[in-house]
UniProtKB/Swiss-Prot annotation:
GO terms for molecular function: orotidine-5'-phosphate decarboxylase activity. GO terms for biological process: 'de novo' pyrimidine nucleobase biosynthetic process; 'de novo' UMP biosynthetic process. The keyword Magnesium does not apply. It is an enzyme of class 4 (lyase). Pathway: Pyrimidine metabolism; UMP biosynthesis via de novo pathway; UMP from orotate: step 2/2. This is Orotidine 5'-phosphate decarboxylase. The gene is pyrF.
Amino acid sequence: MIIDKLYENVEKKGCVCVGLDTDISYLPKGFLNKFTNIEDAIFAFNQRIVDSTFDVSACYKVQIAYYEAMGIKGMILYKKTLEYIRKKGGIVIADIKRGDISATAKMYAKAHFEGDFESDFITLNPYMGMDTLEPYKDYFKNKEKGVFLLLRTSNEGSKDIQYLDLKDNKKVYNKVGEKIENIGKEFLGNCRYSSIGAVVGCTAEENNIRKELKHTFFLIPGYGAQGGKAEVAKYYLSGGNGGIVNSSRGILLAYKKYDEEGKNFEECARNEVINMKKTLQII
């Protein structure tokens, strides 16, 4: 199963997931000026980030919104970025956050697990109900695909719904977590984690969430620019390999710490990943 490949990558390369949420404003001006169009510039930037971090990163998360906002040309850029990573043998998480009734979900599955926009994992929103997962299950079993379901996210507004108290002294996200854990047991890899993972932000700590979801691999956003703490992320990593920690702006804009002109932006990105790995290392 695909979760075994991701688990193995974490063992070999560390737990960092590089986020390619690439905005045109992130590109150094000197680099951008070498190109006649925005799409070529961003693709070249993405390539250099991937090449410089490939041996020290577990995987890459590509946020589709940054590409959708550019229209048709942006979606071609999105396709090229996914293909570039996968052809190198890398693992791609398409951050699409879909969630819909089964007939529509079937089309989302086809769109993002096959064809032009094929990826290894996608993010989904389970709050319409677990029946929305049904069209994806064949891909988990037979086509080496996986998902990360939104559980407890890193944004401030997550408290509006996810943190609501229930009658049994649990919160909404605890109940959703129980369902994710139970459904995931059907798709366990050799690593004993499921190809159905969960998105758990490291901007807030919750001790029981890791203990209760023993077979659920975590995608951990919020580190760095969003204020997520390394201590929280480490706990969710479950001894070093129970999840991946995503950073986007912190890596893509690392050059601004050392070299405002960004002449060596890819080297700065690599160093940021290495520093993240050291900070997150379980001692």
